[in-house]
């Protein structure tokens, strides 16, 4: 009965968190579009589509699998196995994150021209490199927390990540454009907000 209540409580917390994140993401698009203009916003959305692909490849199913392994070890009282599983998962996530971050950082021009047909988005793609590494590492910790049945740290972390992404992205984009930098740099500044949000 207690486990069922904990599950319902955790699901409710996660649902509220998802709603808040969706609202923040929706609100974010309006001022960002006004700041960057059509040209800059096109670079941002193009680069973000590449980020989403790499994010999906880097984390697809892995946090869920980790949470199940952690939950099983925790239920059976195998603390050492739980710790070992987390260490292996963290190392795996780190390797995946480094590989994908290097691809984004070293080949942004090729990705922008080949897949986006928008060469001006190259700088924004490069700016995403730190974010994909940080997201991979954070995903391991989220899977660990979920496996232990504690949804509060995961939900709070995700909401704060989106909040700081919104704030830092808007500030960076606005400041860079006001300083006289072009739209590609302004778009890259908005993208850096994703990395800042991941650090938080």
Name each model-derived stretch.
Residues 135-157:
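Membrane-interface junctions at transmembrane-helix termini in multi-pass inner-membrane proteins
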């Amino acid at each position: 009965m207690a486990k069922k209540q904990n599950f319902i409580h955790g699901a409710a917390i996660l649902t509220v968190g998802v709603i808040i994140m969706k609202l923040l993401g929706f609100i974010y698009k309006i001022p960002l579009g006004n700041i960057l203009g059509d040209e800059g916003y096109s670079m941002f959305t193009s680069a973000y589509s590449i980020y989403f692909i790499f994010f999906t490849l880097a984390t697809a199913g892995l946090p869920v699998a980790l949470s199940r392994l952690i939950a099983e070890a925790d239920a059976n009282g195998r603390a050492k196995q739980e710790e070992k599983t987390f260490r292996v998962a963290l190392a795996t996530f780190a390797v995946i994150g480094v590989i994908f971050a290097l691809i984004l950082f070293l080949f942004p021009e090729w990705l922008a021209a080949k897949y986006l047909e928008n060469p001006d988005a190259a700088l924004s793609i490069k700016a995403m490199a730190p974010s994909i590494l940080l997201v991979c590492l954070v995903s391991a910790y989220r899977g660990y927390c979920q496996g232990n049945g504690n949804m509060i740290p995961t939900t709070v972390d995700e909401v704060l990540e989106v909040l700081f992404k919104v704030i830092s992205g808007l500030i960076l984009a606005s400041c860079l454009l006001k300083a006289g930098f072009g739209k590609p740099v302004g778009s890259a500044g908005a993208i850096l907000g994703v990395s800042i949000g991941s650090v938080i």
